[in-house]
Swiss-Prot record:
Name of the protein described by the UniProt record: Pentatricopeptide repeat-containing protein At4g26680, mitochondrial
Organism for this UniProt entry: Arabidopsis thaliana (Mouse-ear cress)
UniProt similarity note: Belongs to the PPR family. P subfamily.
PPR repeat locations: 167-201, 202-236, 237-271, 272-306, 307-341, 342-376, 377-411, 412-446, 447-481, 482-516
Segment annotated as transit peptide: 1-38
Organism lineage string: Eukaryota, Viridiplantae, Streptophyta, Embryophyta, Tracheophyta
Localisation: Mitochondrion
Length: 521
């Protein structure tokens, strides 16, 4: 296959700057950026098929037109990339036939495909607005190809662009596919190269890129990219602006989020419930609950009704701040305006009251949940079990564990941790350790907090043998060890005259960065 290279410098980092303006359209000509500094689109002359190659192309074309796949199958052994390419060029006006032949050649003789054959079918599909099919082929190439292949795909499309009388949407599809695959460097390169040749991606593809960036926590880059979109006169849509609001909120720039909300009308858009919910969540995250309530009240003035997400966000904010009366008040308002609470609503309130130790209120919300036919999940029961175990009411907690079977729910790590905590509160460390073993047998994984609860419970009972057994489990599972806990266990063992056990325990901890000298006196 011909090795392709171009003289455009590849950007391996962002060069995004300030923003301005408008653009973006389905009309291919409007993908062109203004100005005359664009690099000309190159054109490569490809050799025409001759002799046996020409005969093959003509015969294959005839069989394709007549849908005579039996005869075509007999030609499959003679396929190569040059012949496949020229057949695809000959039938490119029929995208269905092109795709059918492309897939047939891939199945019958995979070695007959090259980047050039892929490029031609991609041009054909995008010209006919079959973007999902094009992106499916691109995804297959980019995921299953070699390490250096992504960098070559743009070049292959570029050098066949004029030959196929293509449209900029072929590069747009490449950019969007890189975005969906979270290949951010390749997406950046494609964006910068598109600009070099006078093309811009659609706002939908830009949204896909920003969404992937935000999904990976790359808020700073997403916001810089938005500024570059505006500088390139790519007009945002409401989905874009809601993502930018989310980015501002996640980076703590709440004032900028509010400014953008106010600017939406100037940009030709009405704020949506998503816009307000995003800002409400941002303010709740920062503990600015009064401001969050004001935003909820602003929704009505804007002709929007708070929905279940709005109320759930506020309830979660108040519960996290342990302002449970305010959370209950929001719940009451929610029901008053006929917004139906869901599983998330009840779970948040049940968990909040359980954390506070008010099991009666938690159980009241649980009963209301049952009466209203709201689906309970493992989080519902874990919250109730946690609240009961926190108060050492392990028998009542066990009743809810039995409820899990009736609801076809399986205990998870949080369920076992709560039950272990209950036994530790009751100073039943041995029973807690038995629950730990059941937890492991069930395939659940305890965390550092669970182990430390068990160690503390054994130490309170002055059962340092049991505590050392838990420490060994922690070492075996590479759970971080707290030096004060280790000192406490080892000193307890020494006071009981179990120096050999201390020595053995410290040997097992070798390499865990604990100083043994302090235990040798």
């Amino acid at each position: 296959m011909i090795r392709i290279s171009i003289g455009v410098n590849r950007r391996l980092r962002y060069q995004f700057s300030s923003f301005a303006g408008y653009s973006g359209s389905e009309n291919p000509r409007l993908f062109k950026t203004l100005g005359a500094a664009n690099t000309p689109i190159p054109h490569r002359r490809n050799p025409e098929p001759k002799g046996q190659d020409l005969d093959f192309v003509n015969v294959a074309h005839s069989h394709l037109i007549q849908s005579d796949w039996d005869k075509l199958n007999k030609l499959s052994d003679h396929l190569d990339s040059f012949r496949v390419k020229n057949v695809l060029l000959k039938i490119q006006k029929d995208y269905l036939l092109s795709l059918e032949f492309f897939n047939w050649a891939k199945t019958r003789n995979p070695g007959s495909h090259s980047l050039e054959t892929h490029a031609i079918v991609l041009h054909t599909l995008t010209k006919n607005r079959k973007f999902k099919s094009a992106e499916s082929i691109l995804r297959d190439v980019l995921v299953n190809g070699g390490v250096d292949l992504p960098a070559k795909v743009f070049d292959a499309l570029l050098y066949s662009y004029r030959e196929c009388d293509s449209t900029p949407r072929v590069f747009d599809s490449l950019f969007k596919t890189f975005a969906h695959l979270k290949k951010f460097r390749n997406a950046t390169d494609t964006f910068m190269q598109m600009k070099d040749y006078g093309f811009l991606p659609t706002v939908e593809s830009c949204n896909a890129y920003m969404s992937s960036l935000l999904g990976q926590g790359r808020v700073d880059i997403a916001l810089r990219f938005y500024r570059e979109m505006r500088r390139c006169k790519i007009s945002p849509n409401p989905y874009t602006l809601n993502m930018v609001m989310s980015g501002y909120c996640r980076s703590g720039k709440l004032d900028k989020g509010i400014e953008l909300l106010q600017d939406m009308e100037r940009l030709g858009f009405r704020a949506t419930d998503v816009s307000y919910n995003t800002l409400i969540a941002g303010h709740c995250e920062k503990g600015l609950l009064s401001s969050a309530l004001k935003l909820k009240n602003m929704m009505g003035k804007s002709g929007l009704q708070p929905n279940v997400v709005t109320f759930n966000t506020l309830i979660h904010g108040f519960c996290r701040a342990m302002k449970l009366q305010e959370a209950s008040k929001v719940f009451g308002e929610m029901k008053a305006v006929n917004v139906a609470p869901n599983t998330v609503t009840y779970n948040t309130l049940i968990n909040g009251y359980s954390q506070q130790g008010d099991h009666e209120m938690a159980f009241r919300f649980y009963e209301d949940m049952v009466c209203n036919g709201i689906q309970r999940d493992i989080l519902t029961y874990n919250a109730l079990i946690f609240g009961l175990c926190k108060q050492a009411k392990t028998r009542k907690a066990a009743q809810f564990v039995k409820e899990l079977d009736k609801e076809n729910l399986v205990p998870n790590s949080s369920t076992f941790s709560a039950l272990i905590m209950g036994q530790c509160v009751r100073k039943n460390a041995d029973r807690g350790f038995e629950l730990y073993k059941s937890m492991i047998r069930s395939g659940c994984h305890p965390n550092e907090q669970t182990f430390n609860m068990l160690v503390s419970a054994f130490c309170r009972n002055e059962d340092f043998d049991g505590a050392s057994q838990v420490l060994r489990e922690m070492v075996r599972r590479s759970i971080p060890l707290d030096s004060r806990t280790v000192h406490q266990v080892c000193n307890g063992l020494k006071h009981q005259g179990k120096d050999q056990l201390v020595k053995k325990l410290l040997q097992e901890m070798e390499g865990k960065k604990f100083l043994q000298e302090s235990f040798n006196n």
